[in-house]
Amino acid sequence: MEFKRHNDFSEIDPAAWNALVEQSIADTPFSRYEYLSEWWKTLGGGEWKNPQLILVSASDNGSLVGIAPLFLHEYDGQQALLLVGSIEISDYLDLIVREADLPRFLPALLDFLASSLPETWSALDWYNLPDASPTLPALKAEAERRGWNYHEEIYRPTPRIPLNGSFEEYLSRIEKKQRHEIRRKMRRAAESGRVRFYVVDKNADIEPELEAFFHLMVQEPNKALFLRDVMRDQMSRSIRAAHEYGYLWLGFLEVDGVKAAASLNFDYKNKLWGYNSGVSRDFMELSPGWVLLAHTIQWCCENGRYEFDFMRGDEEYKYRFGGVNRYVMRARAIR
């Protein structure tokens, strides 16, 4: 295996990168070339100041085998190598490598990082690794073999709704009180004659829909604080990239022809990944946020999606809708 450090994302072919992602342990929207390369341009919407890119690829006979998208930054008392995308806006991160290649890729990667980087680093600090990622036991074993200090902890819950049937079948599995509440709110919205749910067409001009989404997002004070200019730029880049590559799912609920709620998701690998949302305060009597989420789950059921992933966060509504916890982890190895 031949390892190479790259100074820029443009040095790796996007098609080869994404083809590897789709065969890898990291097959999520957040590992794709278009997402991570755009993330790097704004450093996660201003999350990091002056990090150093450590983008490493491994090839066999000219064929891409693995990618370690890393950056160097002082963090938590160490000169740490973190995964590009860390920490706050990329819900799942991992090494980009086929599971069968991980046992030879990871030790060779660590050897390369230890021997070939002119920069001094003292830790690997990898956030948002899925709890089922084979990277976790592999990194633990490799760190122990090298005499490094290894620590692993739950970072955030990522509740998910398993879906394998009709919307009625889904409703039958959630708590009775919540089932009645969802049905009641959907029925009230429908009977008002004022409400329309729609999903933005994949061929639509995304710019006006993007503006409408941000307008709704900032109705919530915490999200308004979050969506400063550099973060808005970052999110716009991510949304445009997902739209260009065909996996953006942006749904709206209109009341009297006015957009009252928005749901931003990635429709990727036969599941919906719930990334963000926004709700107007003008139509709260119709519970537009709840009604839109219910319609979104119904859409998943009717279109054969096997799961709705709420992604990171333990907000109560996720569990009311039947979310079951999985987790993303933080793995830290100090040498």
Model region roles, listed by residue range:
Residues 24-28, 72, 117, 193, ...:
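A generic secondary-structure signal for well-formed alpha-helical elements
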Residues 179, 184-188, 312, 318, ...:
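Basic side chains
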Residues 149-158, 325-335:
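Conserved catalytic-core motifs of GNAT/GCN5-like acyltransferases
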Residues 2-86, 128-158, 162-284:
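A conserved beta-strand-loop-helix scaffold within acyl/acetyltransferase catalytic domains
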Residues 73-151, 269-321, 325:
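Acyl-donor binding region in acyl/amide transferases
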Residues 157, 203, 314-315, 332:
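Conserved beta-strand edge residues that scaffold enzyme active sites
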